[in-house]
């Protein structure tokens, strides 16, 4: 009988990539490297050579040190205690690590992803004799104000419940046994690289309401959709991501800081626990899982952090929740792939990125979706990935490959951010391919006028862009009267509708009804202005209308309805006077 070699020795070390020999291993097995037991993962097997990427700093380890195979693939612990947690890329809770070793993470330290000592109150919703299948929800735990649903792990066989308990248990204790011998605890493990199974994927036809006018109004993303936010440095990617994490109508938010600046992660870690969830008034952190993996942490862990995040998101989706996952930024993950690929001496592709860049990106984004879960509930994972192209160049491989996969593209523009136009999303370069599938939702839930209004707004903004070249050459006064009005209406759309103050308590979130009312008021001004032109009113009188100057203040008024009605009435009477005078 062949003896399984679980211990080998190090032969070669090249930064985060090490080679071991005399070791039996499968692809993606987790191994412990060196005397300090650093965590690594098998990424290539070449004859006797086992090539491992190490998730911790390898300085100081030398050839000849032992390598031990755990025989397990990289997995996350899924169960009560996930919400409010702050993890590093390999699901080590940072709060536990601080207690173990202070503010700086030492090497070779492990900590379980969930607390194995804390007791949770388990309420069964199934009883003995009930038939259960993989993914069936058998009970509930009130974790925060969110109910954590305990399910039969997807790898378990179907069977009848033999015994199910009620009361306080730790996540390791058996709470349910099936007649086929399966024992179910509140926690189960799942390999991060394997998508969790579902009954079927559904057409994403419900929008993710974000409260950001430019996103909901012009470029909506569906629940279960994918969106990319590319943009150069300082254009507001992280602020946009954080606004989405705070305000989007997803029930759970998973925020992955993947290779971003440490200070930005610090901001998230200090801000999120203090922020209030606008829907419940509870701390926002109670529906959030944070994965902090800053740029000075080992590069290999960036890949792990992305997979860890999406696996946790899929777990909550399987409970029937709508989850939004923010990955900030996927470019750093791609750079980590490039570094490891070059250490492996693989043939480089475009700009040095590996040839499998597109495959890895699509593997990640394709795990998004609105689904019918194994428990026959509806859940969704919406993935919003930030991309940081060097120098703001959208033609580089990461941006281009991401564009091929995602259906919603929010292009951030440094020029807009320099003009202090926030969110700095360029309405000419951005697009959403969800408009057709979402139009029915808007007709039924906002107004049948919504879709024509949106189309009109986009046409005005495009027309303004075409006229801008002439304006820069000869000035707006040289344009025909109609086009001068078009430029004024476009300015109103930009300054009143598209600009939004993320730091104003009212304007930071704008619901769909208010968005519709603001657009309708601008459209009303536009229609009246063209009618006045035909009646012979001069352009300067139309653009100098007093009532329209009150419109921008609507954004900052909570109970805005009476105010907007007053402005529209005043506008109407002013236009009537102008027409009569003409």
From Swiss-Prot:
One of its GO terms (biological process) is proton motive force-driven plasma membrane ATP synthesis. ATP binds at residues 231-238. It is a peripheral membrane protein. Keywords: ATP synthesis, ATP-binding, Cell membrane, Hydrogen ion transport, Ion transport, Membrane, Nucleotide-binding, Translocase, Transport. Has multiple subunits with at least A(3), B(3), C, D, E, F, H, I and proteolipid K(x). Component of the A-type ATP synthase that produces ATP from ADP in the presence of a proton gradient across the membrane. The A chain is the catalytic subunit. This is A-type ATP synthase subunit A 1. GO terms for molecular function: ATP binding; ATP hydrolysis activity; proton-transporting ATP synthase activity, rotational mechanism; proton-transporting ATPase activity, rotational mechanism. It catalyses: ATP + H2O + 4 H(+)(in) = ADP + phosphate + 5 H(+)(out). Belongs to the ATPase alpha/beta chains family. It holds the Pfam family ATP-synt_VA_C. PANTHER family: H(+)-TRANSPORTING TWO-SECTOR ATPASE (PTHR43607:SF1), V-TYPE PROTON ATPASE CATALYTIC SUBUNIT A (PTHR43607). GO terms for cellular component: plasma membrane; proton-transporting two-sector ATPase complex, catalytic domain. It is found in: Cell membrane. Its EC number is 7.1.2.2. It is an enzyme of class 7 (translocase).
């Amino acid at each position: 009988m062949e003896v399984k070699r679980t211990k080998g020795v190090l032969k070669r070390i090249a930064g985060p990539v090490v080679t071991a020999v005399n070791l039996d291993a499968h692809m993606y097995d987790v191994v412990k490297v060196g005397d300090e037991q650093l965590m690594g993962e098998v990424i290539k097997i070449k004859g006797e050579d086992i090539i491992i990427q190490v998730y911790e700093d390898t300085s100081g380890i030398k050839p000849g040190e032992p390598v031990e195979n755990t025989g397990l693939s990289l997995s996350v612990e899924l169960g009560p205690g996930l919400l409010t947690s702050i993890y590093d890329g390999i699901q080590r809770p940072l709060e536990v690590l601080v207690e173990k070793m202070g503010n700086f993470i030492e090497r070779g330290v492990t900590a379980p992803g969930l607390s194995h000592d804390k007791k949770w109150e388990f309420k069964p919703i199934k009883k003995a004799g009930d038939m259960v299948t993989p993914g069936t929800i058998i009970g509930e735990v009130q974790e925060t104000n969110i109910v954590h649903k305990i399910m039969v792990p997807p790898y378990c066989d179907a069977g009848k419940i033999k015994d199910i308990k009620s009361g306080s248990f730790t996540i390791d204790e058996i709470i349910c046994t099936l007649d086929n011998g399966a024992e179910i605890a509140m926690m189960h493990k799942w390999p991060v690289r394997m998508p969790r199974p579902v009954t079927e994927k559904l057409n994403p036809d419900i929008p993710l309401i974000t409260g950001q006018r430019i996103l909901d109004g012009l470029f909506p993303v569906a629940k279960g959709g994918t969106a990319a936010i590319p943009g150069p440095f300082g254009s507001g990617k992280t602020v946009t991501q954080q606004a989405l994490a705070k305000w989007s109508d997803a029930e759970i938010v998973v925020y992955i800081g993947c290779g971003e600046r440490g200070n930005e992660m610090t901001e998230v870690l200090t801000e999120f626990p203090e922020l209030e969830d606008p829907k419940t008034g509870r701390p926002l952190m109670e529906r959030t899982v944070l994965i902090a993996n800053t740029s000075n942490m080992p590069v290999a862990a960036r890949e792990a952090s992305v997979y860890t995040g999406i696996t946790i998101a899929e777990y909550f989706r399987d409970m029937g929740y709508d989850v939004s996952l923010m990955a900030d930024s996927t470019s750093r993950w791609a750079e980590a792939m490039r570094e490891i690929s070059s250490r492996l001496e693989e043939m480089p592709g475009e700009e040095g990125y590996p040839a499998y860049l597109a495959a890895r990106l699509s593997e990640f984004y394709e795990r998004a979706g609105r689904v019918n879960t194994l428990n026959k509930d509806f859940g969704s994972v919406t993935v919003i990935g930030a991309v940081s192209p060097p120098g703001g160049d959208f033609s580089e491989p990461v941006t281009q490959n991401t564009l091929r996969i995602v259906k919603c593209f929010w292009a951030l523009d440094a020029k807009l951010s320099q003009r202090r136009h926030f969110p700095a999303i360029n309405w000419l370069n951005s697009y959403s391919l969800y408009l057709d599938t979402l139009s029915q939702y808007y007709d039924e839930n906002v107004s049948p006028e919504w879709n024509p209004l949106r189309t009109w707004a986009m046409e005005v903004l495009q027309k303004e862009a075409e006229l801008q070249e002439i304006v820069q050459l000869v000035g707006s006064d040289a344009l025909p009267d109609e086009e001068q009005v078009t430029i004024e209406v476009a300015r109103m759309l930009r300054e009143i509708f598209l600009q939004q103050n993320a730091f104003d308590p009212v304007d930071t979130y704008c619901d769909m009804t208010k968005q519709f009312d603001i657009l309708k008021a601008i459209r009303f001004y536009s229609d009246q202005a063209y009618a006045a032109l035909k009646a012979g009113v001069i352009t300067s009188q139309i653009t100098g209308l007093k009532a329209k100057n009150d419109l921008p203040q609507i954004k900052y008024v909570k109970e805005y309805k009476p105010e907007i009605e007053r402005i529209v009435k005043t506008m109407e009477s002013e236009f009537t006077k102008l027409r009569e005078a003409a």
